[in-house]
């Protein structure tokens, strides 16, 4: 398929720059700092935005809101929620006024991914057996907790894995030296690859 020249995004032969910009926007969106998302937008909510009440609803539905361990878990989920909101605000303002590089979106992306995983673990613990068994066809808080736990890795992959975010933070935000790589500054077409396995003799 051939496209006309006016369909090119960015400069010809400079697609990597466009791809990096796209990934940066994706990281910002997944991290909760973009107004152009359909999911939760911590930036728009502000410091006093709506709280995540799913953990509280769970303990109340199971009648364990007086349990000391359950209350500690609910408090942990609340702290993660408040910390994320403050982090998104600070990083977004920093990128806007130039005090932080645009790649700083990796900070909110990484925190969002790790805190989301932890909050799904908390909801699973609070739901107990309700997270693995429920009346057929019914949408319950326990079912939601169980299904969210099974999907918990999604946020760690969208916009780049946690390991990639740590590399971005280290190299492009903190200015630390890059890891050594044998193929650095080598055109992709010249990067050495593993040889294709040969078929066994007589196959």
Task: Give the ranges of each region predicted by the language model.
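Glycine-rich beta->alpha junctions and the first turn(s) of the following alpha-helix
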Residues: 1-85, 155, 194-203
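Acidic/polar loop patches that form or flank catalytic/metal-binding clefts of enzymes
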Residues: 6-9, 124, 179-182
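Hydrophobic alpha-helical scaffolding
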Residues: 9, 45, 102, 109, ...
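Glycine-rich phosphate/cofactor-binding loops in nucleotide/flavin-utilizing enzymes
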Residues: 15-35, 131-203
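Generic, well-ordered alpha-helical scaffold segments in large soluble proteins
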Residues: 22, 54-58, 62, 73, ...
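Catalytic-loop motifs flanking and including active-site residues across diverse enzymes
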Residues: 51, 80-83, 108, 163-169
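C-terminal helix-coil-helix/basic helical segment that borders enzyme active sites and/or dimer interfaces
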Residues: 68-71, 82-140
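A glycine-rich phosphate-binding loop feature that marks nucleotide/adenosyl-phosphate handling sites
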Residues: 73-76, 109-111, 187-191
